[in-house]
Amino acid sequence: KQLEGMTFRQVLNLGIVPEGVEREYNNKNYKGGMGTLIEERFFGYKANNEQEADFQEAGVELKASPLNMKKDGDYSVGERLVLTMIPFDKPINDDFYSSHVWKKSEKILLVYYERDHELDRYDQTIKYVKIITPSSEDLKIIKEDYRKIATIIKAGKAEDLSESLTSYLGACTKGADGEDAARQYYPPHTRAKKRAFCFKRSYMDYVLHERIMARTKRRIPSLRIQRSSTR
């Protein structure tokens, strides 16, 4: 909660630098995400690209994501929430709860900041910070989405994946304009665009208003869901 109301520049000014980190954030050459900045310069952990959660002891994954302010003054999420790459080059786990995507999504420390294109990226203000876990109702849909994605991959048809096939958990393209391709583990071993598991933007908009901003009577467009109890 200490982060709420701070700008990224104020985070940098705290002077926290983990041992062995030489990244220079406060310049135009830094192309990384703001989540890495928070992990290293607020929590003091050296960022890594491992499949485990960012804070392994607590099993918590850190994600920083932008918010857009609409004309009516309400917020909407600025983008989907990318979780982890989909491994096309090896077998996909049939059990959702044993998968890397569950390790990355079981507990997420969400840091939402207001995106203002008139301000420098380091002067964006952090609005909300909260740990979220998918509710039991959400997990029913997420697990079914995972099953659909895994079934297509195991059929050797990863090139047919599309975010439109699922409800909450998506398979978004990665790489330069989705052009990077990888050979599939499953026959006929054709190449497919690299993709990552993500929580779709519509689902994250629901999470923002129902779990973080605690608003009521809001639903994901075109989806029928039951409101979950507070967890």
Residues covered by each model-derived region:
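Nucleic-acid endonuclease domains
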Residues: K1-F55, E61-R231
